[in-house]
């Protein structure tokens, strides 16, 4: 097939970024160089050939017989054929400009386009090729939403991250209470699950989200932040962590404490910027200008 999606290249970039951090910690400078070159080369290809400024999505790219990029995949009417979850994946790779990020977020957040009542649609609901009876098309896949959720922590979109998790938890709860099945996906039209009835890809992200916001002793970061070490008190009334932060953005760290108490939050000993999403659940801003920070949460 001569048509390339965005998700494969984007996941290679994201994986290479993770490996770069590990290689840096291990002192593997040659590996860091190799990964960095791959990231740059693939990122340049996506930006040069795949971005469609009119649509605000990255495109499927058709290649010629020699493997050279030829054109973006479009319908007979000229509509971009990748107004889909695939078309937003370079955001997850962390390679989008601020303008591209804004365009993609506008699609993801729009209840007319991708943010359905049961989660993020795999296909833009306003696209000419959106269908309600497909397998990928017309449905919500939690595994891909997990990647979007992590990315929202990376770029400081705490409110939207919570909305993704909360809508997914509520949708999953309704289906499981009715059928006691964990289907592959949820239908946007009916809100019901479909296809294989014991699918771990649906239930695993749900467990992560439930813990991320409601289970004391849990913390989460985006893809571009890494916890060097951490400690919780046994009763979850004190937390400390050393965090490395690589993307130069105001990212978010989620920490869930014992919800029976009040706390003070500091970053490098200074009062932190944070939001208490619910009692004991903290969304802490990691300053964009610091690569390494000390996070501490303690009783007032």
Describe these PLM feature segments.
Residues 1-6, 37-41, 47-59, 103-124, ...:
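Active-site acid/base region of carbohydrate-active enzymes
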Residues 19-36, 152-155:
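Inter-helical turn/loop segments and adjacent helix faces that build the functional surface
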Residues 57-63, 68-107, 134-236, 245:
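C-terminal capping/lid segments that line or modulate ligand- or cofactor-binding pockets
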Residues 116-141:
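Generic long, charged, amphipathic alpha-helical segments
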Residues 244-261:
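Surface-exposed beta-strand/loop patches in extracellular or lumenal glycoproteins
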Residues 266-270:
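Short strand-turn-strand beta-turns centered on an Asx-Gly dipeptide
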Residues 276-300:
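C-terminal beta-strand-rich structural cap/linker in extracellular carbohydrate-active enzymes
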């Amino acid at each position: 097939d001569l048509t390339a999606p965005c998700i494969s290249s984007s996941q290679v970039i994201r994986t290479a970024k993770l490996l770069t951090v590990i290689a840096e910690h291990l002192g593997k400078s040659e590996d860091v160089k190799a990964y960095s070159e791959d990231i740059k080369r693939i990122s340049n290809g996506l930006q040069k050939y795949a971005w469609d400024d009119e649509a605000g999505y990255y495109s499927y790219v058709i290649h010629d017989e020699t493997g050279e990029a030829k054109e973006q995949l479009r319908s007979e009417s000229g509509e971009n054929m990748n107004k889909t979850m695939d078309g937003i994946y370079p955001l997850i790779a962390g390679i989008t400009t601020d303008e591209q990020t804004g365009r993609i977020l506008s699609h993801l957040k729009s209840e007319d386009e991708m943010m359905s009542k049961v989660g993020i649609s795999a296909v833009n609901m306003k696209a000419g090729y959106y269908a309600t009876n497909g397998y990928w098309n017309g449905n919500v896949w939690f595994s891909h939403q997990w990647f979007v959720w992590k990315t929202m922590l990376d770029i400081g979109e705490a409110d939207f991250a919570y909305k993704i998790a909360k809508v997914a938890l509520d949708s999953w709860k309704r289906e499981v209470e009715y059928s006691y099945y964990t289907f592959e996906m949820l239908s946007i039209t009916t809100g019901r699950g479909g296809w294989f009835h014991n699918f771990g890809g649906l239930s695993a992200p749900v467990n992560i989200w439930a813990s991320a916001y409601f289970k004391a002793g849990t913390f989460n970061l985006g893809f571009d932040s890494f916890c060097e070490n951490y400690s919780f008190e046994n009763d979850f009334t004190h937390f400390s962590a050393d965090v490395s932060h690589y993307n130069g953005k105001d990212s978010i760290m989620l920490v869930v404490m014992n919800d029976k108490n009040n706390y003070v939050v500091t970053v490098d000993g200074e009062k932190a910027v944070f939001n208490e999403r619910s009692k004991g659940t903290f969304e802490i801003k990691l300053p964009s200008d610091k690569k390494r920070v000390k996070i501490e949460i303690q009783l007032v």
